[in-house]
Amino acid sequence: MITTAEIGPITRPEARELAEDETAAMVALLGDLSPEEWARRTDCPAWDVRAMAGHVLGMVEGFTGLRRMVAMFRAGGKLAGDGPTIDGVTAYQVMMNEHLTTGELVARMAAAAPRQARWRTERTLLRRMPSKEEMPDGTVETWTMGYVFEVILTRDTWMHRVDVAQATGRTLDLTPAHDGRIVADVVAEWARRHGRPFTLELTGPAGGTYTEGSGGVELTCDAIEFCRTLAGRAPGSGLLAQQVPF
């Protein structure tokens, strides 16, 4: 049993490895899909698998250089209008990659994987900059760009890999070292956000048993379903109603 205090923050060397490995895992999953599977609808209502992959590619390539990142957010801001900038950014990513064949999309994602992992974790000054993010409940949080680069972008690709597996019925390739580390980091943030005692047993290769305080609720669920619930993909009640950004 692990207390949440024992779950250390993801270090920059870890972040680089997790980012590169997660993109490679997405490439492996997408590269094995049939034409029919590319057209399946996902848990993101506006996207089929093909559109979701276009977003992921846009995010991967968009964080391989400062000029590219700035241009992406400027274009996304224009598309968003009065709405959240991130919605415009994701729409821009899908639009810019919709002309690619699925083979081209996968090849470009594979080529950019190590570059984006390196660039995201070498931004010593940029990582300190604040970034305002609108949450699903309408509140606005201030994050650091380091949190975006080293945590959120990897979580985003990871959750979309889960989305693709859900849409296609494919079995996720999960390991304790990679997926378990991502899930543990989610557990630690979830615990900080709700601040209440609990014992949580997460089953599956990415799972573990976590605790905080005493006398709290006891929860048991699949590790992937836990994260899907916290990401808003599935309904949650009690402590599982506390969402975590992905």
Regions found by a protein language model. Give the residues of each.
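Short, helix-capping/interhelical loops that line the mouth of catalytic, cofactor-
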Residues: 1-14, 62-117, 121-122
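An N-terminal domain-cap segment
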Residues: 2-54
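Amphipathic, well-ordered alpha-helical segments in soluble domains
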Residues: 22-25, 29, 59, 112-115, ...
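Surface-exposed helix-capping loop/turn segments at secondary-structure junctions
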Residues: 32-38, 122-128, 166
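Short, contiguous alpha-helical
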Residues: 39-80, 132-193, 226
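C-terminal interaction segments
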Residues: 213-246
